[in-house]
Structure formats: C-alpha cells, structure tokens
C-alpha cells in the first residue's frame, strides 16, 4: 500500500494533541497491514462524500481517505472529530 497525504490531512494532523497523533500513527500502521480489519470500522461514505471511505481511530477521531486498485494507493484526505471531517 502506498500512502499519499493531502494538505488538509497534514494540516489537521499538526493540530492534534500528542496523544491523538500517536493514536493516528498506530492506526495507520494497522491500516497498512490490514485495511479491512473489523476494528478499524472501515466503511464507505454516502451523500456528498460518496467515493470516500473512513476509518475509526479512537472514540470520535476519524480518518477520511480514498483508495484505488484494491488499496494499492490510498490518499489520506482529513483527520479529526466525526462532525468536522464529515463536512469535507
């Protein structure tokens, strides 16, 4: 899996508290190993966000992304609280 990082993801990641940054990095390690792990709650988004997917990091924290070629390439679009990231 090749990870790409959108500017919005990088900007949002920088604003996270240290504990949440660690949780995001741990989740991404797990995601790279097994993108469909049930614990990640990997799911397609609907409505205005159709074509995008999201995984759960911890509690309210989500990562929104797109994937191509069966997860060969993943672009991380945003990270943050549920209500904020679903307003892309």
Task: List each model region and its residues.
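A short, surface-exposed loop/turn module that caps and links secondary-structure elements
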Residues: 30-55
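Enriched for short, Lys/Arg-rich terminal
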Residues: 2, 7-11, 15, 22, ...
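A generic secondary-structure boundary signal that marks alpha-helix termini
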Residues: 17-18, 33
């Amino acid at each position: 899996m090749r990870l790409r990082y959108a500017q919005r993801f990088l900007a949002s990641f920088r604003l996270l508290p240290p504990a949440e940054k660690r949780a995001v990095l741990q989740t991404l390690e797990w995601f790279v190993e097994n993108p469909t792990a049930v614990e990640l709650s990997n799911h397609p988004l609907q409505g205005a966000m159709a074509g995008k997917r999201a995984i759960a990091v911890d509690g309210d924290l989500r990562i929104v992304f797109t994937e191509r070629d069966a997860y060969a390439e993943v672009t991380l679009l945003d990270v943050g609280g549920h209500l904020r990231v679903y307003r892309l």
